[in-house]
C-alpha cells in the first residue's frame, strides 16, 4: 500500500498562513502525511564530502552542497517550537498526520513531546547512527531517505534500527 507524503520543505518561507494552506490542501488531496523540516542552521554539521560533491568515473556519487551557502539559505527559514506545536495541531485539525525531518539529536525529545508520532531522516543523516538510535527510542515509525547515502551506510543503518518500524525512501535532490 502506498503512503503519500506531501513535502512542504521550506516552501512556506516561514509564513504560517502559507503553511496552513499547504496542510489543508494536502489533507483535501488525500495525502497521508504533510511534512516540514526541523532545521536550525546553527546545528548544521560541516561535512567535507558535500563541499564539492563526489564524482567517480564521471558519475556523481554525492551532491555538491557547500556548508556556508546552505547555512545562509536556511537561516531565514527557521521555525520555532511554537510553530512546530501549531503545525502538529493544525495537521490534527485537518485530519492528516504531521511529519518532520529532524537533523539533530537535540531536537528529538522536543519533537516527540510535541506530538509527532513518526519522523523522517534526511539521506545526509542515514549514516548518522547516533541520530538513528535517538529517533528509534522516541517515534513509532521512521522514514529514512537514502539518496545521498552509500550502500554500506544503508546496510549499517538497518542494523542500528533493527526491531523498529521503518521505510527507506530514495529521494533525489536536484
Predicted regions and their residues:
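Catalytic cores and adjacent flexible loops of soluble metabolic enzymes
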Residues: 1-174
Amino acid at each position: 500500500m502506498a503512503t503519500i507524503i506531501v513535502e512542504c520543505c521550506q516552501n512556506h518561507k516561514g509564513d504560517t498562513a502559507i503553511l496552513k494552506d499547504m496542510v489543508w490542501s494536502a489533507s483535501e488531496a488525500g495525502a497521508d502525511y504533510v511534512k516540514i523540516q526541523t532545521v536550525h542552521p546553527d546545528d548544521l554539521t560541516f561535512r567535507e564530502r558535500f563541499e564539492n560533491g563526489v564524482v567517480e568515473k564521471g558519475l556523481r556519487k554525492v551532491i555538491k552542497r557547500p556548508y556556508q551557502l546552505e547555512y545562509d539559505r536556511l537561516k531565514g527559514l527557521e521555525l520555532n517550537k511554537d510553530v512546530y506545536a501549531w503545525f502538529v495541531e493544525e495537521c490534527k485539525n485537518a485530519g492528516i498526520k504531521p511529519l518532520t525531518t529532524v537533523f539533530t539529536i537535540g531536537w528529538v525529545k522536543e519533537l516527540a513531546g510535541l506530538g509527532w508520532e513518526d519522523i523522517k531522516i534526511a539521506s545526509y543523516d542515514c549514516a548518522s547512527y547516533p541520530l538513528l538510535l535517538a529517533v528509534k527510542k522516541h517515534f513509532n515509525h521512521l522514514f529514512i531517505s537514502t539518496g545521498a547515502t552509500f550502500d554500506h551506510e544503508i546496510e549499517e543503518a538497518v542494523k542500528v534500527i533493527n526491531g523498529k518500524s521503518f521505510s527507506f525512501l530514495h529521494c533525489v535532490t536536484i
